[in-house]
Each structure stands twice: as structure tokens, then as C-alpha cells.
Amino acid sequence: MRTANNGLLDLFDLEKKGVGLNHDYQHWKFNRHIFLQAVMPLSSTNKPSQYVNLLFEEMSNYWIDLKHKNDDSVVIDISTWMRRFTSDFISLLTTGQQMSTINYYYRMIKNEEVTKEMIDSENFIESINTFVSDNQILFVPKILRNFPIIKSRVDHMLGNCNYFYGKLVEIVRKRREEMKNSDDINKFISKKNDLLTSLIIANTQYDPQPQKNADPSLLRPMNDDEIRGVMFDAFVAGTDTTVNTFCFALYYLSHNPDVKKKLVEEIESVFQDDFNRPITFDDLEKLKYCEAVIKETSRVRPTVSMVSRYSSKSDKVAGYEWPSNVLFILYVRGINTNPLYWKDPEKFDPERFYDPQEIENQHKNSFSMFGGGPRMCLGRKIAMIEMKTLLALIYRKFDVELVDMQAPLQVETSTITICKELNVKLTPRKRVV
């Protein structure tokens, strides 16, 4: 397990839900099995890249519309835009439907009218942000739950989670109703092909990949609350971690012009001077340096600085015998910058993950961008697809500069490290004639 269950996970109805914070082994095993079964097919298709292309085109058109009248550039807080981008992306991937948070933010900047649907989408994303920014309250000992300052935070988070859960269950039930009322349910399922539909039909007569040899306890369908738990994980884990890693990458690229130059050269070698054609799954396979930049960003500035594991039985770790019920905390950033494993550990150098010799010499446990073991991030392949596609799209279409090269990264750390603000200047690139 990740933690000892002496906090408030049960109060927030997370103790047996989803996979990220689930503390019940049997429920976690079941949820993980179904989640993995649903998400893996998406990882090997063009669908994630198609959604990133679609949303980036919308967002970049807004940026171009916002550019200065006497200048060809626009200054934006990229972190604010990217939080809305990733929320719309996860919504498309999980439900097949876009929220409208990118459009909402653009209209607010332009002081244009917004619809109720847009406001609802914005409220939804804000509920995710609230959970991410204050989720350490989940681990407060139960005995402190009613202390004055803590009580107000707990009550606020409870209200936020109840709203979030309610919206997710509403989405699940609406999809079940759509399936029930469809003239041809098989055609409906084939057309949707999203995470939510896959979760609903898992272990039913409509499951295209029925499991026959699995543990019998894993062969039942999910109920609405169980699906809600998995959807919760998808939205929370699929938004902020990606946003922050992407923003940190832009920061470090701006401070390392040689690295940025090599990245742009790789992008140009794949796409030539075509700034507009959609990026495909096959293109991503060629963007090796782009992936190295993302990995090096995660090494230098991991979004999750500490990882915990709670032992359910006695074991031998690091040459010592440990009893059961011990909480182990791994300081990820410390490992990532330990000179025992990394040469010049403070230096931003993507060659560590690009040069074959560097990769071969790397200690196998010195870098774990997506965690390790059975609790490893289930959406890691999709996250990498999203970030690689985004990096290629933005540096293919724009020259990206920090507004203030002297300003330090504006971060806030709780259970994850959040990029609070990153102001960049974007200038559309021009084709070389």
C-alpha cells in the first residue's frame, strides 16, 4: 500500500476507490485490473495524439488572436492555459466529449459571454485544482479532524469532493442511459471507444476482450461508484502532473539554448517546414530527443518529490529486517540528483536519456518518472504521448521565450510540485523560403 490508513481516506470515500489512494488490496487489485484493461488499448492508437492535435489547434488559434496589435507575439501564463488543455484532453479521452475550459478561459480574457456549459466545465476543473493543492489534508490523523483550523479545511475539501464525485457519477449514469437507449448498442460502443465506455462494458456480454483465465474475483462488472473512483484517478492524475512537467520543460529549455536548438532541429527533421500537419503516433517514435528532454525535466524537477510505501508484512530492505506496518518514504528528488548515480546531477542534460552509452550506464533504480512496481502509473504511456506531442507542436509553430529570464520557477509543493505561473512570449514561426 502507499500509506498507513490512519488518516481520513475513509471519510473522503477513497479508502476502497480507484487505484491511486486505495488502501484495500482486493478492491485495488480489481480496480487496477479493469483500469489497465481499459487504458492499454488507447495507449497504442493514434487517438491520444489526435486529441492533442485537435485541442492544440484550438488553443493556438486563440493565442494568435490575442497577439499584440503592433507585435507578432503574445504573452501568456502557459500554466493556466495548460491546466485547461489537459482537462479537456482527459475529458475527451475518458468520455469522448470535450469540456469547454479552453474556450471559457479565452472568452474570459476577451471579456466575451460564456455559456452555462462553460461555467460548469470551469467549476469542474477548479474542483480538481482544489483537490490537488490541498490533498495533504487526507493524511491528517483522525484525532485531529475536529481541531478548529483543520476542521475548516476538512469540511471545505469534503464539500469539494462531494461536488466532484457527484459530477463523475452523473457522467457515468448518463452514459449508461445512452447505451440503454441506443438502437444498436454494439455500434454505439464501437463509435464511442473511450475509457468510460470500456469501464462500463468490462466483464459484460459486450466486452470485446473477455477475460477467461483471470482470478474469478476480477471477472465481475464495475458498479457506478467503482467507475467513479477510477474516473477520479484519471482526471486528478492525468491533469496536474502533465501540466507541471510540461511547464518545467519550457523553463529549462529556455535556460539551456543548446538543448532547445537540438530539440527544434529534431522537430524540423521530422516535419520539415510543415507547421500544420497533425502529429501521428509514428512521428512520435522518431522524436527521441524530445522524449529525453521530458525525462530529464522529470529528473531535475519531479512533480512528485516523495513516494511512500507501507509494508503489509515483514521484509528485508537495504540489508535490514523490517517488521510489518512500516511506512517507507523514498525521496525521489534526492535520488534523481545523487552524485553517486549522476554525473553533474544539477546540470540539465537530456543526453543522459538520449545517448545509448549514457542509457546503458544508468543505474536501473536511479530514475523512476512514473513510479515502480505494481503501483506504477497506469497512464504513463498516454502521458508521454501527450507531452511529446505538445512539445513538438508548440516548438514547431512558435518561438518560445520566458518573459523574465531572471525569475525563478514559481512553484508550490504539497504532495506534488505545482507550477503556479510561467509567463512566456510566443511568436509564430515563419517558413523559410
Regions of interest found by a model, annotated:
Residues 1-51, 78, 82-89, 107-145, ...:
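Cytochrome P450 substrate-recognition site 1
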Residues 17, 232, 237, 278, ...:
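Cytochrome P450 heme-thiolate "Cys pocket" and heme-binding signature region
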Residues 40-44, 160-245, 287, 309, ...:
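Conserved cytochrome P450 catalytic core segment spanning the I/J/K helices
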Residues 43-54, 65-92, 101-120, 145-167, ...:
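Cytochrome P450
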Residues 56-60, 75-114, 165-173, 195-199, ...:
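Hydrophobic mid-domain F-helix/FG-region of cytochrome P450s
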Residues 99, 257-259, 380-417:
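Cytochrome P450 heme-binding "Cys pocket" and the immediately downstream C-terminal segment
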Residues 166, 170, 277-318, 339:
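Conserved cytochrome P450 K-helix E-x-x-R motif and the immediately C-terminal K′/meander segment
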Residues 330-358:
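Conserved cytochrome P450 K-helix/beta-meander segment immediately N-terminal to the heme-binding cysteine loop
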